[in-house]
Structure formats: structure tokens, C-alpha cells
């Protein structure tokens, strides 16, 4: 199984460690990867990543609605509420969420997040 990561800002793919905006549309690139048989997309909104200011739910769900393959949300998770909000979009094609800094800084307990997901969502 191949899962591809797309890092984007304002809907455009960022490259070379987020230094450059490629002007390539994230949705268009996702559709190409879908055509190539990629299993899932990890979508990171780089304006949110590491900032712990919440996931860009609108952009992530918009991408998920435009393609058939599942999308894993990444960037900005700050607390359990962010996980609850993005998980509510499971039927839109959101298959998971990546948590980084919020775990390292103990803003989220992995057990609490997993228990919530196990009780509330089909994919778990």
C-alpha cells in the first residue's frame, strides 16, 4: 500500500521543506495520485502544522470530497476537540488524523483519543 503526503498552503503544494510554493493545486495533484493507484493521501496544511491552532478542517474536507481515496488529516491538532471535529467527517472520506506536537507536549493523551475513536467511529 502506498500513502502519499501532500503539504499545502492556501490549496497549493509546498515543496523543498515548505520553502517554495509550487503553484500546483493540491486537489489536482491528489487526483493524479488517485489515478496512479495510491491508497490514501496524508494532507498537511503547513500553516497549521506544529502551531497547535486546530486543523484546517475546511481545506481537508474539501480535498476529501474531491477524491475517492481516503484522506488522513495532518497539521494543527492541539487537543481532543480537534480530533472530535475532524473525526465527525469520516463519511466525507477522512480516515485518520496525525498528532505530533500535542502528544509531545502532553496536550492530548493517546489513550483518551483512541478510546473516543473506538467508541464513535467505524474505521477503528
Language-model region placement:
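Glycine-enriched alpha-helix->loop->beta-strand junction motifs that scaffold or abut catalytic
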Residues: 1-2, 37-39, 66-70, 88-96, ...
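Catalytic cores of alpha/beta
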Residues: 58-93, 113
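Short, well-ordered secondary-structure micro-motifs
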Residues: 14-17, 52-55, 83-85, 108-110
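Short, basic, helix/turn surface patches
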Residues: 2-12, 70-77, 98-102
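Conserved anion-binding
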Residues: 1-49
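Structural motif corresponding to alpha-helix initiation and N-cap regions
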Residues: 23-27, 57, 80, 107
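Glycine-rich phosphate-binding active-site loops on the catalytic face of alpha/beta enzymes
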Residues: 46-48, 75-79, 90-112
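Short, basic/aromatic-enriched C-terminal tail that caps enzymatic domains
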Residues: 106-124
Amino acid at each position: 500500500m502506498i500513502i502519499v503526503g501532500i503539504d499545502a498552503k492556501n490549496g497549493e503544494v509546498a515543496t523543498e521543506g515548505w520553502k517554495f510554493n509550487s503553484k500546483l493545486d493540491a486537489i489536482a495533484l491528489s487526483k493524479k495520485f488517485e489515478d496512479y493507484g495510491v491508497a490514501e493521501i496524508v494532507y498537511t496544511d503547513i500553516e497549521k502544522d506544529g502551531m497547535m491552532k486546530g486543523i484546517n478542517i475546511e481545506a481537508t474536507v474539501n480535498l476529501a470530497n474531491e477524491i475517492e481515496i481516503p484522506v488522513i488529516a495532518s497539521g494543527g491538532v492541539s487537543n481532543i476537540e480537534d480530533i472530535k471535529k475532524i473525526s465527525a467527517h469520516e463519511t466525507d472520506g477522512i480516515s485518520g488524523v496525525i498528532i505530533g506536537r500535542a502528544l509531545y507536549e502532553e496536550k492530548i493523551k493517546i489513550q483518551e483519543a483512541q478510546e473516543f475513536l473506538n467508541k464513535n467511529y467505524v474505521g477503528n
